[in-house]
Amino acid sequence: MSEQYAALRGNVNLLGQLLGQTIKDAQGQAILDKVEEIRALSKSSRSGNENDRKTLIKVLHALSDEELLPVARSFNHFLNLANVAEQFHTVSRFNDVGFCQLNPLTQTLKTLATKANNGQLNHNHLADTLSKLHINLVLTAHPTEVTRRTIINKHVELSDCLASLERTDNLAQEREAILNRIAQLISQAWHTDDIRRSRPTPVDEAKWGYAVIENSLWHAVPRFLREFSQHVKEHLSLELPINYSPIEFTSWMGGDRDGNPYVTAQVTKEVLDHGRWMALDLYGRDLETLSTELSMSDASDELIALAGQEFEPYRCVIKTLKNQVLETVMHLGAKIKNQRSEAQDLITDINQIKHPIEVCYRSLLKCNMKVVADGLLLDVLHRLNSFGLRLAKLDVRQDSSRHGDVFSELTRYLGLGDYNQWQEQDKQAFLLTELNSRRPLIPKRWQPSPEVQEVLDTFDVIAQQDEQTFGLYIISMARTASDILAVQLLLKESGCSFKLPVAPLFETLDDLNDGHNVITTLLDNDWYRGQINNTQNVMIGYSDSAKDAGMMAAGWAQYEAMDKLVQLADKRGIELVLFHGRGGTVGRGGAPAAQALHSQPPGSLKGGLRVTEQGEMIRFKFGLPDVALQSLNIYAGAVLQSNLLPPPEPKPQWREVMALISEESCEHYRNVVRHDENFVPYFRMATPELELSKLPLGSRPAKRNPTGGVESLRAIPWIFAWSQNRLMLPAWLGALTGLQAALAKYGVETLQEMSLQWPFFRSRLEMLEMVFSKADSWLSEHYDNALVEDMYKPLGVTLRKELAEAISLVQSLSPQKSLLADQPWIKESIALRNPYTDPLNVLQVELLRRARSSDNGSEGDIDNALMITMTGIAAGMRNTG
């Protein structure tokens, strides 16, 4: 690595040395020597030494069954430690040259202040945009987090230790104690099972999400709001109100039942109880501290009236509130455990906590104790506004076909025919008639099938809660207006007393292209306009559209869908909230946050940002308070910049170019993935797709249809499999064909102009550059040589040739003629991990060969080592699905 990353390199070396000592103590010198030999060969191979590459393959293939597991674990642990060091480096005091050297939010506010002072930006517009800033981060349980929570907790403490080591005033014995603690944590992690032995339940996943909030975001959000307010005051001379709350959290964990039969109505109720229990427990801890701190006696009349004639009115109010909170915590704890309890459910509304806290705050201000008011008390108010009574609201998601099945059974029971066989106009007419009717539709004596009853039970759970509990009801695979109206009718039939926003999820190429027509049909209806409170939520699917059409075509379809929806919303005078269902990988829409937001159509963030944070990306972006603070700054700065300094409207010719790229790339992608009869057998042989099912990643099954082929495979295992063999195919297949067609028709100058002036197109190329830097043809070829039958090998040769040509073409479009020249941090990050990921790939090939051979089967150490290579490669790639 270059000298500018010396601090990072030093931490990586330190952790690596201590891991080496752990391996020696646990496995013996011989295993450590073998690991060091493999590491040296891998580094030499990365430098271009072909002989050492061949030796590396030979050494790894010659490992005995007894050596497989410790060697695989060694490289897996090193990659996890490298990730700890890298994540810490982003917030290290020595990071003066990384991608985060300056607070991106501060830089944005400075730019806005300059433009406002120069008359380029209207002050009122600036203040209004700030007041409407809204960022909703949606934590999802997509099974891409492969690291066990117990290991993650040790890694969090390791990061704290690295921070302690940076202190310049450490005494020698203090430094020695820190190093000893690091050694203990590394040893603890080594002697802990790397792999979950059972799949997490939906409740387990929800607990994991709540733990991220408890350990990181609970601390980061008040800091963010405090610093944000200070920066706004300093740079823009604006005072933000104390109830200013631009950050909100939502969860899919326990609410996303699309394709997951384990998320039942009962599970959703249990998860809601868990969320309220944990939130109140955290508030209880804050109230305990406040009751110690707020010992003052000077108080406002408002507080005295609330406290009575108490000598210490603040303590009186806080202690009363604390006791109510703790009693509710006891009640919920017993309920979760199915135990009886005398404790009562006292706190059921957030205002029961917020009101007395606000009274205390106002009293302190009135009594000239602002410095006290702006301490923990203000932090608690910020938490109440951001986390509410359940830490995160819950989204409910279900496939559109499940709602159709409800009405299909019901209409057949009522003698009206089969709803699923009706024309779209007939469905809409039926649904709107029932929505406008005052009588119930569902007969009390009707006994639906268990599948339909489960859907109805979910709506009953929604109806039993208040409107602060849920975020959205999301309809996956939404295609028509009737899909949305069907959910509205089910909400009505359940007796839901509030207007829960319903969002269609447009996720295939055709559905994205037709999305604005669906919303137009809905907005043409008076009943619907009256139902939505002038706000329309639409979710844009990135994963399935990329799997359906390839990354280039999907990216353009997403852009056009958003652009048309923005224009429609402006024309109809409604607020549009676009919800981005991005994954961590390029193949599922992933990109650095600021880059992704700047590349969206102008006006697409006026309604705020709502975006999924999935799997391992939650840990990478929010796992530590300092890192979470940085991520919140990036999001806030990017949203403000996009709304106040929007990207340019693309020229008509640029749209023509993208339409051509989209059409040509999609056709080529589908010709390979859908129409080449050799593709599916090749995919199954060249990747560990079949073996991935043994890895207990998440509660949701890997396939929508267990007997189906690639088309039924979920986007996550589809991406995971290709990232394992380093071909990274879903993220680039078709790009070469599309770009070549554009070059032939429009010339290189046009594409270079687009790259320079249009953030959307530039982001497409930068995402390709990142993928190409992670892809590796020699490793893909090695998988093919060892695992693929001869008749299917030519396809692999063709794909690797296409990859090489695509890399060359994208490099030629870069001003520096090299990959990631403008993203040196990402380039260094990949280079840091490659020498440790490569051996795991080579080892995985050998393990797959042994596991698939009829003699060995896949048992014991081979099975364990194979799963460890999967988790290790995922750590090396820094994303899985």
Curated annotation (Swiss-Prot):
Active site: H142, K547
Substrates-to-products reaction catalysed: oxaloacetate + phosphate = phosphoenolpyruvate + hydrogencarbonate
GO CC field: cytosol
SUPFAM superfamilies: Phosphoenolpyruvate/pyruvate domain (SSF51621)
Sorted UniProt keywords: Carbon dioxide fixation, Lyase, Magnesium
Needed cofactors: Mg(2+)
Pfam family membership, one: PEPcase
GO molecular function terms attached to this record: magnesium ion binding; phosphoenolpyruvate carboxylase activity
Listed EC numbers: 4.1.1.31
Record PANTHER family: PHOSPHOENOLPYRUVATE CARBOXYLASE
Record family assignment: Belongs to the PEPCase type 1 family.
Function: Forms oxaloacetate, a four-carbon dicarboxylic acid source for the tricarboxylic acid cycle.
Entry protein name: Phosphoenolpyruvate carboxylase
Chain's gene name: ppc
